[in-house]
Amino acid sequence: MKTTHFLIVGVVASMMAYGVKGEDGTLRDDTLTVVASQFTAGDHMSVCDPAGNRITFVVKERSKVPQTQQHVRQDNALAKVGPSLDEPYYQVRMALPIPSAYTPTEQGALVGLDEGVYHHMHSAALEALPNGDMLAIYFSTPVGLAEKDTATTFVQCRRRAGNDYWDMPELLFDTKGGNDQSALLFRDGQRIWFFGGGRGMTDMVPFRVCYSDDNGVSWTYNVPRLDKPASDYTAQPVSNAFRDPEGNLYIVMDAAGSQSFLWRSSDNGLSWHDMGGRTDARHSSIVPLDDKGTLLSIGGKNNDCEGWNPQNISHDWGATWEKATPGVIPPLGTAQRPNMIRLQSGNLLLVTDSYQHKKKIAPPAGWKMGNECVCGVSKDNGKTWTFKALPGTLPQHHRVAHPSVGYVTVRQSDNGMIHILTTTNYPGLEIEFNEAWFWSAEGDLTADTFAPYNLGEGWTVDTASHTAVWTQYWSNGQKHMESTWNIWPTPRDGHRPLCGRIAEGPARHYDEQGHLVREYMFHDGVLQDSIEGETGIKDEGL
């Protein structure tokens, strides 16, 4: 029995129960179509479970190439250009526009955003590319649908080297009839790996494996070869990947319940093996402490050890883990995870929330950082830590008592700058700073001035009013859509203007003959009313 699954956006499609026989007892032979631009099918696109049920992934080319994948530098001349590493530097930017970030209804398409870009953008991946750009990948879910729904997509954003503005979010890929959830990016020399999760497809595909050798312009797509069906897992890659001295590649994934574990590939991303051990928290952040297999796992959520976030040590690359001990940060809950990386200096860096927002649980006694979002640095492989509050953070969009970095991801670029990507805020942020700022007495942003506005193709900027108009065209050259944006806005829950985009004013839609079809009015990123182009009649109830 062979079926091909497609999805109409806005309609919940039933997830196929892969790995079981059809109703008539025959083996399944199913196809999932992956809609993307400049993706090439790799050598491994089909899997069979032990019973013989097959699922095949097919790449289908989009009718357009996202701007994120166009005009990308392929030299590394700008990769090490940046602020001085000797002087404290700390800046905050909006990483996402409003819309689509957490508007009450799906309003992104009304201002010109790409298909598949929805209001919920979460569990993000971040990486500093060889050319100096920053690349972020989120999974995106429409209003009112669950994260495990088949309507989810993977969405990409790029901030180009030397620019203070992120490109507008665009579709990376959409698995029609399958779930796209939880992203991980890993820079491996000149190659960028992307590992994308997705629930409910088959135990033979707990994640997808993509790689790019041209800074994210094009990608090769594969599904993993597992040595046995995945078990005791949740199909969600977390935020860390690394290689060992023998070249084995490891990625972190959620286990079932409040645990995490490592997958290992010994053939450069083709075949994968569950290392077997489990940490004591979901969304754990794991880094090597040496080249002999000693790993440190910190966090991430839904568990505690004596009132603190659990911490585990492995001495065999994650095959086993020592019993959890109380960690150095407070326990976390829903919509929270920490992230830890090793810096170029050799120090460890850790970023986390302090307050458990959904359950309204304050940090444990002994925590000295209040309810702030914090970063911590360890000079001795995690034995001791120094913490500092992160200024300019925002609360979660629906829980506004205290600031949050959400599902945070941290990377360091070749120029030595540290980049933090936050989620669940209104909107998500990028925080950029250096170690000089961390060790200084500075406790705030170091400047409120930015490079000249450079918003990309189709944007006309009025620098005096800090506004811009984004214009898109039909293939015949006629104007298709134009929307107006505040490009130096103060977010709803913030206290200062940031580089970013919030819709402010009209968004006009035209037909292919150039006639105005409809005008939508936005204020602070939210739709206020709509006027029909020909009649001038306003819609009610917006």
Question: Positions of the model-derived regions?
Answer:
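Glycine/tyrosine- and acidic-biased, solvent-exposed loop/turn segments at the edges of beta-strands
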Residues: A41, G162, D448-L542
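Hydrophobic beta-strand positions
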Residues: V20, L27, V47, F242, ...
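Vicinal oxygen chelate
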Residues: D29-S63
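Sec-dependent signal peptide cleavage junction
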Residues: G22-G25, T31, H71-R73, P452-L455, ...
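Bacterial Sec-dependent signal peptides at the C-terminal "C-region" and cleavage site
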Residues: V12-T26
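Sec-dependent signal peptide recognition
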Residues: K2-V9
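Asp-box/BNR beta-propeller blade signature and adjacent active/binding-site loops
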Residues: C48, I55-L455, S465-H466
